[in-house]
């Protein structure tokens, strides 16, 4: 049936994209570990980037996702555009995966006198306080979240986020309440 073929092509395309993303992350983590990561920093317009990521996830999600983008026009981040897209996509992907059937994701950005703050806030299942200290470790996964949502993975995503933001001279922090929300805050310096 033609509909089945179209769906199979879509699934194959999605899986190829996932494999490419994972490969890129492994390569970049290896470069970071060796001290060889080259960042090509530039001023990246944040609002259009957040909007593009939101649209991508709304199109491909099987869940009902509501996005709220809270970012002034003209807000920018001095960062490697590819890396910034990858880490924000990773955080949104986690927000979608570790949520119930309907989720609100708030993407926000704000310029400060010290740099730019970017937040990804979701109304998902949250992260138990007892496991929050482990989530940025390589190959670490929060067991309770995987069991609740049936998701799988390698536990590289949040370590990747931390390493890339750190390579930019920034910081990452998480605030979460189990059963309620998670919020990841990325702080990037001015230059």
Predicted segments with their positions:
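Short alpha-helical segment of the dimerization/phosphotransfer core of two-component systems
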Residues: 14-19
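Conserved catalytic submotifs in the C-terminal HATPase_c
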Residues: 40-44, 66-75
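Short conserved segment of the HATPase_c
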Residues: 127-139
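Glycine-rich ATP-lid/hinge loop adjacent to the conserved G-boxes
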Residues: 140-152
